[in-house]
Amino acid sequence: DIEAQRVLRKDIAECARTLPKCVNQPDDPLARVDVWHCAMSKRGVYDNPDPAVVKEKNSKMCPKIITDPADVENCKKVVSRCVDRETQRPRSNRQKAINITGCILRAGVVEATVLAREK
């Protein structure tokens, strides 16, 4: 989805520009949990804290930013696993969202995205 990729690219750039970068964070904005959390929040992924809704909205992003069907399926599985794991513990909705985002990034989903291939 070219339009979704364009908007997400813009959101990532804006989030990377406006969020303070800590010394220990990677230079690449695509490797930063705070940048992805910010960009996904702008897309409304975390508006409703219900785990089923978060899972559905995150999963819907997979085919928008990944072109290989096998990678899309892997993305959806990772999203499901991360949402299930990170919503078990009592935390604020914001912290759960950040943890879900981090879990997805650590699983290597970003490397399969169109955005990562453009570098």
Curated annotation (Swiss-Prot):
Expressed by the venom gland. It is found in: Secreted. Gene3D superfamilies: 1.10.238.190. It holds the Pfam family Sol_i_2. GO terms for cellular component: extracellular region. Its main location: secreted. Disulfide bonds: none annotated. The keyword Nucleotide-binding does not apply. Keywords: Allergen, Disulfide bond, Secreted. Belongs to the ant venom allergen 2/4 family. Homodimer; disulfide-linked. This is Venom allergen 2. It comes from Solenopsis richteri (Black imported fire ant). The lineage of its organism: Eukaryota, Metazoa, Ecdysozoa, Arthropoda, Hexapoda.
